From Swiss-Prot:
Annotated gene: Kdm3
Residue span, JmjC domain: 601-806
Note: Shares a promoter with CG8176, which produces a bicistronic pre-mRNA encoding both genes. Alternative splicing results in mature mRNAs encoding either Kdm3 or CG8176. Efficient production of mRNAs encoding Kdm3 requires the splicing factor hfp.
Chemical reaction(s) catalysed: N(6),N(6)-dimethyl-L-lysyl(9)-[histone H3] + 2 2-oxoglutarate + 2 O2 = L-lysyl(9)-[histone H3] + 2 formaldehyde + 2 succinate + 2 CO2
Cofactor(s) required for function per UniProt: Fe(2+)
Chain segments carrying region Disordered: 64-88
Source taxon at top rank: Eukaryota
Protein name: Lysine-specific demethylase 3
Keyword Cytoplasm: yes
Species of provenance: Drosophila melanogaster
Keywords: Cytoplasm, Iron, Metal-binding, Nucleus, Oxidoreductase
The keyword Cytoplasm belongs to this UniProt entry's keyword annotation: yes
Amino acid sequence: MSQKELAALVATRTSRKRTISSTSFSISTRTDPKSIIEIHIFNDSLPIKRACCEVENPTLKAEQRVQQEEESLGQVPPLTEEEQQRHDEFRNSGSIFLQDLPCFKLQQAQPIAGSSPIPKCRECRRRNLATTEGEPSSVSDVYCRFYEFRRLQFNENGELCVVGFPNPYSEPSPEDIAIWQPDKNTPPTSGYMDIQVCRYILLHAGDQFCYIWHQEAEALSLHQNTDGTIAWKKAVKGTREICDVCDTTLFNYHWTCRKCGFGVCLDCVKDRKEGLRLRRAENAAQKGCDEYHWLLCSDPSGPQEHVLTELMLTQIIAGDALNVLGRLLHEVRTLWQVPQVCGCLLSKQAIEDAQSKEVIQDMIKESQLKQHTSYSSLASEQKVHQQQRLDQLHATKLEFARELGVDYVPGRVWTKETLGKDPITTAFDNLKHINFLRKGLAGLRRFLPPRTMTFAYSTQLAPGVPHEFLCDGRLLRLTDAMHPDNRVLFQEVWKCGQPVMISEVARSLNLDLWHPQAFCRDFGDKPNDLINCLNGNLVPNQPMRHFWEGFQCMTKRLPDAYGKPMLLKLKDWPPGDDFAEILPTRFADLMKGLPMPEYTLRTGNLNIASCLPKMFVPPDLGPKMYNAYGSALHPDKGTTNLHLDISDAVNIMVYVGIPQDGDTRPQMAATQKAIEIGGCDYITRARCQSPDVLPGALWHIFPARDADKIRDLLNRVTLEKGFRLEPDHDPIHDQNWYLDDKLRARLFKEYGVEGHPIVQCLGDAVFIPAGAPHQVQNLHNCIKVAEDFVSPENITHCYHLTHEFRRLSHSHTNHEDKLQIKNIIYHAIKDCCTILTRAVDERLNAELTKLNAD
């Protein structure tokens, strides 16, 4: 395996804990010197090597361990002058301080001969052993588990001692608290957010925050240590704390080992108490782990199991900021007339503040009028009043439905006979072959039903916005990418979890930058991996010129082992978060031309990922490129197999091409046939036959609510073929399936699931909601670029998928939680509450000043 491939297996460098996944492969070659090596990739459940999770050889005695560490001490870089001076001051003053060096460096600061060494965390102990054995170590200072966490002090003899851990209430500084607690005097992290945007975010994300708040409160009841101490782990800039068991981001409450720094999240503790995640009898024990897959303690005396009664309850949020924000959220939503259906007692409280209520009522009215005025010149007081009445009616029905324990969505009619028999609430009763079943989302917002909109209604809702409906009224297509009022129709459909297509995006882009010749010129000599879409094989380390030249010339395409041109796609390029660095000009061009910029830009006020403070590790939201040859001649082979994403995304077609060195008629005929077989409606087929429209890719996007039905079908087909279902794998997340016309027909016949068949042409942008299963088949050669975002409407799906991914095997590419959705929700709510609180204070102060002046 090449160094590049090995490096690609290492998890993000910003995580404090890292994962290295293994890949099983076999190599097929042929004698022709021009042949290409293809590596066959399998998604089998394989043992993994987690770099941070290695536990020392249990057969080593304690004396041998100490000897190894002493030998490695000579290889530790000496303290810098600044570090030495700082520790001299600590020694002379005898003051208590937070550990400011990694454990492996602390012995350098303790020159007393014979003194007991400070216990090392598992990261630093692993580093010492790796150094002793001559292996390179990539552990930086900040990866130390006790960095900025453990309290230290020099005693009277000059020996360094551990004196406990920080108190979350007495030790955070004002700067630490400001990160977490809403403060009307501190500007929010996000960009410009007006009153209506804040109310909109609170409407869609407020209940989810309340659910997280109550879930965090469970930690206190789960804590089993007789020591009631709660430690505070300070948030370290540029570091993402993750659970050592499930790789989910540690949001607040978790449990920590005082000896080695092992950390485990709330959900894993609940699983252990309930007996879940227990190793199956047929599976061999994983080295260094107990029967629940928990890492053994790396204590110098030897590996030991971590016991719940000995772990220390730890919180990350400083002070009482979580409770402060939770109470403030309910007060703000009550004052600002935002419907809340979380069901907790705070949602029913009445706030007796007549003056504030009157002022806020005026501010809401003004902001609605301002928003509608920007949407349409026909806005009026009557229109605003109608919207207020509709909001009030929906809030009343939401409360009524919550008390009865059923779902309510606008437009649904409840009767005594149908109450409790809704297809959404009974959708899972007949599913049998599900490993990841969403039996219920208690405390969360439920799925809204699909929306079929008439053109007459949409025109009345947003007059002047050019648009049409495809898929029999289920797919909105906006035909002017930069129309200022697009958001009205977009939100009406997007909140129901349906995809949207926006055309004419290419007008805002410099398409010369996105041409294959431009990429071949700029990056032709750079090596990268390719994938043969016909069989899924990897073609490693090829100059990208071989790929880009094949875009327009069939004779220049790389041959497979049988001499046939391969159907290639470029794998993971540009890599990771390096798009802006590798392609700065194209990055700037894309950011300038993104449709719905309030959602898709990194600083968009409805992209709530923008609310994450700068000190946090930003989630990798792209952009990403998808470059592949057309496969219309192979209708059962997808360019991108069925999968779903944890965040929302917009995918823009920036280039469509057909090789001109051969007969193009079979390709064109196959394209039209694929569109027809794909289930596209008459309007779509007519559009694709227009001479000035070049279809690029055929999408099938399914509703997120139907993901489990799709799982059930695919698992059933797997069993019918005589294969066994793997417990820690998932037919959608594994991306092994492309639903051809036969499977799609069976899905509709047996489950009633119908997707959105979408043909993406040059300049079209397809918006895919979080959690929506989708697949893509390139009809012609395509270059697509995608940007992810986190919208308030789909926050529930993001949250649920985080929990879904943690149950995948550790070797799965989707296993690790890189979105940190709880942190995003927390800081979005914090910013909205801050802005609304500040707005009413400023208004009251302004009116008071005016009265005094009069």
